[in-house]
């Protein structure tokens, strides 16, 4: 991938994602352990918190994507979304209770819902047939790098300061500040002849192609029955009796996911996306079946590797 194919604004957005994912992934594998081991929450409470957080992001993405089309600007939503997520990060470190975790996770996912569609639209405005793969590949690479560095930073902090989860929540605010700084360097791109979108998101849905509606319906159904990754982390902790090993398993998953994305993308071009997607769902089922009956720590690595291939 040649650097000349990557516009400066895409590089800036890459650093925004790098630091944001670093902060988010410091906390993602730590939060369920903090909830259960420190605050004494049940698995049901963990699931409810994750459900509230994720459905918040899902409901907001379409609305703010449409709103950014209407106003013809992306950067304001990018600053607002990343800024809100940054402010949410340290809450459980300052107020170590379940309410603070709920507020933090919900605000963080609200920020994600605000920024995701406008950010992707801005990335798309810089892409064409010659560089779209390079642009989105670069951004995904920076995103994944942050997703690996974040949990490793959390592991280092747990090693140096055992069971001091509050410190990790506070420390995650630091990379978030860097991310917000880079958002102020993001500039909107004006495309000659481009018209602002009209109409509501509901009107877009009514006029959307039938195939799009069917696909979105299937994805929605799968999302409702899909389990959060936090339960795999908690199961790994129960089996290994180690916070650090459970988080390392999650890091391993991210590495496999990053390494497998491109080759499986090529396979989907060759054999068809339906076949690869169907195979992925089969692997997903095997992984959860395996975690239900996992007998030994060694199998954590095998199952997380398979889960990375599915993702």
Residue ranges and their predicted role:
Residues 1-7, 188-218:
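Juxtamembrane intracellular "pre-TM" segments in multi-pass secondary transporters
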Residues 2-55, 211-249:
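Helix-loop boundary and gating motifs at the non-cytosolic
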Residues 33-38, 149-167:
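Transmembrane alpha-helix termini and helix-breaking/packing motifs in multi-pass membrane transporters
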Residues 76-90, 173, 275-290:
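Structural signature of the two symmetry-related core transmembrane helices
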Residues 91-105, 292-303:
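Helix-loop junctions at membrane interfaces in 12-TM secondary transporters
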Residues 104-145:
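Cytoplasmic helix-loop-helix junction between adjacent transmembrane helices
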Residues 166-184:
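Symmetry-related core transmembrane helices of the 12-TM Major Facilitator Superfamily/SLC fold
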Residues 273-311:
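C-terminal transmembrane helical hairpin of 12-TM major facilitator-type secondary transporters
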């Amino acid at each position: 991938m040649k650097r000349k194919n990557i516009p400066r604004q895409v590089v800036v957005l890459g650093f925004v994602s790098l630091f944001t994912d670093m902060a988010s992934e410091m906390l993602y594998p730590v939060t369920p352990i903090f909830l259960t081991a420190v605050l004494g929450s049940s698995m049901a409470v963990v699931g409810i918190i994750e459900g509230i957080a994720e459905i918040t992001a899902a409901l907001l993405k379409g609305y703010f994507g449409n709103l950014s089309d209407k106003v013809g600007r992306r950067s304001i939503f990018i600053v607002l979304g990343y800024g809100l997520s940054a402010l949410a990060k340290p809450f459980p470190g300052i107020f170590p209770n379940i309410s603070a975790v709920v507020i933090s996770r919900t605000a963080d996912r609200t920020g994600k819902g605000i920024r995701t569609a406008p950010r992707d639209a801005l990335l798309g405005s810089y892409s064409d047939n010659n560089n779209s793969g390079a642009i989105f590949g670069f951004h995904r690479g920076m995103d994944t790098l942050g997703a690996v560095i974040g949990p490793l930073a959390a592991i280092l902090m747990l090693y140096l300061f055992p069971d001091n989860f509050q410190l990790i929540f506070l420390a995650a605010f630091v990379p978030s500040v860097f991310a917000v700084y880079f958002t102020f360097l993001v500039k909107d791109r004006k495309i000659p002849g481009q018209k602002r979108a009209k109409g509501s998101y509901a009107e877009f849905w009514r006029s959307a192609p039938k195939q799009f509606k069917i696909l979105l319906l299937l994805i929605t159904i799968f999302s409702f029955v899909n389990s959060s990754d936090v339960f795999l982390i908690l199961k790994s902790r129960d089996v290994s009796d180690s916070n650090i090993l459970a988080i390392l398993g999650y890091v391993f998953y991210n590495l496999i996911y990053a390494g497998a994305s491109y080759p499986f993308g090529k396979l989907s071009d060759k054999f068809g996306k339906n076949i690869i997607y169907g195979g992925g769902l089969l692997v997903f089922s095997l992984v959860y079946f395996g975690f239900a009956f996992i007998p030994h720590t060694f199998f954590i690595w095998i199952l997380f590797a398979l889960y990375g291939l599915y993702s």
